[in-house]
Amino acid sequence: MHLAYPAVLSALLFSTGLYGVLARRNAILVLMSVELMLNAVNLNLVAFDVWLSKTARDTLHSGQALTLFTIAIAAAEIGIGLAIVLAVYRNRGTSDIDKLRDTAEGPEPDGPGTDGSAPTAAEKAEATA
């Protein structure tokens, strides 16, 4: 197999993840997009490791070992990220990134909502969508 196929697929996956990070407003979807970008990097690491091991006689599989390490770090990152998003959602009532720009600690002067009211059911449904 040519090196171009996994490299193009990796570039497409990374571009899709980058679009998701830049365009999405929901924090969970942003985390999913970051994971997609990490998987694109992992695919690239394995593809180049296999391609380079064809030319080298003594192969160390360092790209595959680095990929396993990256997968373990990504699993920890997504667990911590989801825990943070869940805690923010419980405290603020939304996971919309634009509404969470001002996350200062302490009581808000206007109350929990932007207009002094509690978050509505539609805002909570939007945060989970």
From Swiss-Prot:
Transmembrane segments: 3-23, 28-48, 68-88
Enzyme class: translocase
Region called Disordered, residue ranges: 98-129
Keyword Cell inner membrane set for record: no
Localization per record: Cell membrane
The family this protein is said to belong to: Belongs to the complex I subunit 4L family.
Keywords in alphabetical order: Cell membrane, Membrane, NAD, Quinone, Translocase, Transmembrane, Transmembrane helix, Transport
MF term (GO), any: quinone binding
Enzyme Commission code: 7.1.1.-
Function: NDH-1 shuttles electrons from NADH, via FMN and iron-sulfur (Fe-S) centers, to quinones in the respiratory chain. The immediate electron acceptor for the enzyme in this species is believed to be a menaquinone. Couples the redox reaction to proton translocation (for every two electrons transferred, four hydrogen ions are translocated across the cytoplasmic membrane), and thus conserves the redox energy in a proton gradient.
Membrane topology note: Multi-pass membrane protein
GO cellular component: NADH dehydrogenase complex; plasma membrane
Protein name per the record: NADH-quinone oxidoreductase subunit K 2
Bias-annotated ranges (Low complexity): 111-122
